[in-house]
């Protein structure tokens, strides 16, 4: 339905002002079919406002937005809210379940709204499929008050996907969940993307979730784009101090370690297969340098291991440069955090 080489979401020069306060400032980006696109930033950076603009719940002051063939600049007659909601589903942190309806009745509601002529048997089949996918079938006749937080959020996902949308807009949907429920929900979102190709825009302050899900990430700061690119590149080689802070990279090590003479503090980024190779120990054995590992981590980015180390590299300048050249040739990304004295 939507060609892979053309954006399913296009945002061009979007601004949003309330009174004299600019909430969004010249935002432009594209999301292609089948991507999971992350939006991160500190509180008040404009993330949720931007997502509501994508759902046409909020109108930008200026700029154009296209989502799944619908455009903010077209007339209301062209942009039927009901037709839009069949293609684009919005999931919020609050879940928004009807407390007086069972799980089944909550999920049935959008189907009856979008497909009034659908047979009862087909409705039940589609709801059961959604419940099976989310491991909720046994809770089919339960009321929301009898569900855990993770189960409620999965019901909200079932409500969103039962009408077969092409885009999911997710606003902080894991922020109130415990770690196990968060992992369960993110596994289901990733499976939706892999098996059904559903494009997702994922707003979150939980960086571990963004690492796991998102192939592209937009970093926002004070209503503007701070940085935009593949999530693993933002992790391995952030260009902005805001991005570095959000990804919890090296702020602690930079502040507490005072390096000596003939020593420099480096951050080493290991992409894909490099993350599991023991090249550091080999480097120490082969060269006239010493390495003190200050901190490090290995993360899975959409099931691919990526890692970083913060090290103190000691030795003569010539030997340090040789060591860095070897690492660079092997594909390691190096950033100098503190220079030699």
Curated annotation (Swiss-Prot):
Residues involved in ATP binding: 41-48
Catalytic reactions of this protein: L-methionine(out) + ATP + H2O = L-methionine(in) + ADP + phosphate + H(+); D-methionine(out) + ATP + H2O = D-methionine(in) + ADP + phosphate + H(+)
Classification via Pfam families: ABC_tran, NIL
Alphabetical list of InterPro entries matching this protein: AAA+_ATPase (IPR003593), ABC_SmlMolc_Importer (IPR050093), ABC_transporter-like_ATP-bd (IPR003439), ABC_transporter-like_CS (IPR017871), ACT-like_dom_sf (IPR045865), NIL_domain (IPR018449), P-loop_NTPase (IPR027417)
Enzyme class, broadest EC rank: translocase
Cited function: Part of the ABC transporter complex MetNIQ involved in methionine import. Responsible for energy coupling to the transport system.
Quaternary structure and partners: The complex is composed of two ATP-binding proteins (MetN), two transmembrane proteins (MetI) and a solute-binding protein (MetQ).
The protein's name: Methionine import ATP-binding protein MetN
Protein's gene: metN
């Amino acid at each position: 339905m939507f060609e892979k080489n053309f954006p399913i979401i296009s945002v061009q020069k979007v601004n949003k002002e309330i009174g004299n306060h600019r909430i969004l400032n010249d935002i432009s980006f594209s999301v292609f079919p089948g991507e999971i696109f992350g939006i991160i930033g500190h509180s008040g950076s404009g993330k949720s406002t931007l997502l509501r603009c994508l759902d046409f719940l909020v109108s930008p002051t200026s700029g154009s937005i296209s989502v799944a063939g619908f455009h903010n600049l077209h007339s209301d007659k062209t942009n039927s809210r009901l037709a839009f909601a069949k293609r684009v589903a919005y999931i919020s942190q609050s879940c928004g379940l009807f407390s007086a309806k069972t799980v089944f009745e909550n999920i049935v509601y959008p189907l009856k709204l979008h497909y009034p002529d659908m047979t009862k048997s087909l409705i039940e089949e589609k709801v059961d499929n959604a419940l099976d996918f989310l491991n909720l079938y046994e809770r089919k006749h339960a009321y929301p008050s009898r569900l855990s937080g993770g189960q409620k959020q999965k019901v909200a996902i079932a409500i969103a996907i039962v009408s077969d949308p092409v885009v999911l807009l997710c606003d902080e949907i894991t922020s109130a969940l415990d770690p196990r429920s968060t992992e369960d929900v993110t596994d289901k979102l990733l499976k939706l993307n892999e098996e059904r190709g559903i494009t997702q825009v994922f707003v979150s302050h939980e960086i571990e979730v963004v690492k796991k899900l998102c192939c592209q990430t937009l970093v926002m700061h004070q209503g503007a784009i701070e940085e935009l690119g593949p999530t693993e590149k933002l992790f391995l080689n952030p260009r902005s101090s805001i991005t570095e802070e959000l990804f919890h990279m090296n702020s602690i090590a930079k502040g507490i370690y005072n390096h000596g003479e003939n020593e420099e503090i480096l951050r080493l980024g290991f992409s894909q297969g490099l993350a599991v190779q023991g090249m550091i120990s080999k480097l120490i054995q082969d060269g006239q340098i010493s390495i003190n590992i200050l901190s490090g981590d290995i993360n899975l980015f959409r099931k691919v291991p990526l890692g970083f180390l913060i090290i103190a590299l000691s030795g003569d300048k010539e030997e340090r440069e040789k060591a860095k050249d070897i690492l660079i040739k092997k594909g390691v990304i190096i950033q100098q955090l503190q220079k030699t004295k």
